[in-house]
Structure formats: structure tokens, C-alpha cells
Curated annotation (Swiss-Prot):
Lineage: superkingdom: Eukaryota
Span of the transit peptide along the chain: 1-49
Protein name: Presequence translocated-associated motor subunit pam17, mitochondrial
Species, as recorded: Aspergillus fumigatus (strain ATCC MYA-4609 / CBS 101355 / FGSC A1100 / Af293) (Neosartorya fumigata)
Cellular component aspect of the GO annotation: PAM complex, Tim23 associated import motor
Taxonomic lineage: Eukaryota, Fungi, Dikarya, Ascomycota, Pezizomycotina
Known function: Component of the PAM complex, a complex required for the translocation of transit peptide-containing proteins from the inner membrane into the mitochondrial matrix in an ATP-dependent manner.
Amino acid sequence: MHLTLMNGTLRTAALSGRFALASPSPLPTATPLFQCCQKMSLRTQARPVSTSTTRILLKPSLRPQTSSMCLSPIFRKTAFRLNSTAANASRAEVPKLDWNSFFKLRASRRRYTLASSIIASMASTIIGVQILSEQDLESLGAQVMGLDPFVVLGLATATCGAVGWLAGPFLGNAIWRLVYRKYKPAFLMREKEFFDRIKRFRVDPSSNSIANPVPDYYGEKIGSVQGYRQWLKDQRAYNRKRRSFII
């Protein structure tokens, strides 16, 4: 009887001791190992959040670039249209020039250049004489060329006049372009076409002679449409004489 009671008490004590050993003990949260593991876990959890935020921040920055890339062809098209309209307007403003008007303008340019050559030669001669009169021509002629002072003065005066005559066409051409600047583009186009025709239809000057001279090789005497037709007839007559050996 007493033995059975003792066995029961021993069994209960053993069972209670096992259950006490099997129950989990609380982890020490204040240890440094636990704190280190906790920090590592927090870092691993914070990484995807940071990447997601960077992605979210990068997405809006790409939108203005795509919009600018899409809008750039539109601006290019509008700029091209504006340039094309301006070019068409400038072409429409250029006046048309027929051949008779071209020859009239060509003759007026020749008159401008001739008048400017005369005026420039006179001005350069007067200025040159005034400058030379102040110089010692006797010693200059004797030292340099050994000539008489009057001969040196005459040569210097002629040189001054020649310089003015050669500079006159440049001055006259500039004045003519300023006066007729409205017809300048059309005139230049007609002039290019005119010289192309002259180069195409003029004769070969290799067989030139006294009996059969070359008729106006550069077309300088042409002053109208009738003059151009006469020039073509002269070129054909020269070729006929050259072929028939009437030289």
C-alpha cells in the first residue's frame, strides 16, 4: 500500500520534471548576438524598399524626356514649313525679267561703268598732280631714272589717270547694283544664261585671219534680241567661210 503510493508520487515528480525541462526558456534579448542578428534582418528588409523607391523616383524623370523626344519632330516640321514659306515668298517677290529688259539693264550698267571710269580718272589725275607738284622731281628723276623732270611728271600723271580709269568700273558696278538692287537676282540669272549661250554658239577662233575675222567672240556688242540674232548669223557665216576655205 505504501509502496504503491510512493511509486505514484515518484511518477508524478518525474513527469513534472520532464515537462519543465521541455518547456522553452525565454531568449535573452539583451545579448549582443541577438542585437546583431536583429540589425542584419532589418537591413535585408530595408533593401528592396530603397530600390522600389528609387524606381518610383526614376520613373517620373523619364517622362519629360519622352515628351521632348516626341515633340522635337513637331518643332522641326514647323520650322521647315516656316523656312519653306519664307523661301516661297522671296521667290515670289523676285520680278521676272525678259530679254529686252535684260539688254537694257546691261547697257545701263555699261554706261555707269564708263561714266565712273571717266570721273575716277579725272579725280585721280588731279590728286596725283597736286601731290607730285609738292615733290622734288628734278632730284627724283636724276637719282632713279636719269630722266628729265617734265618726263617724270608726265609719266606720273598718266599713271594716276590709268589707276583711276581701272578703278572706275568697280565703283560704277557697285553704284549700279545699289540703284537696281531689285532686279539683281533676275539679272544675274539672265546673265548666266546669256553667257552660256555665247559659249555654246560662238565659233572656234583657231582659224582666224584678216579675210575672215572672228565676229564678236565675247558678245559685247549685243544690245538687243535682234542684235543676238544677227550675232548668230555672223557665227554661221564665219563657219561657212571656214568650211569652204575662203580665208
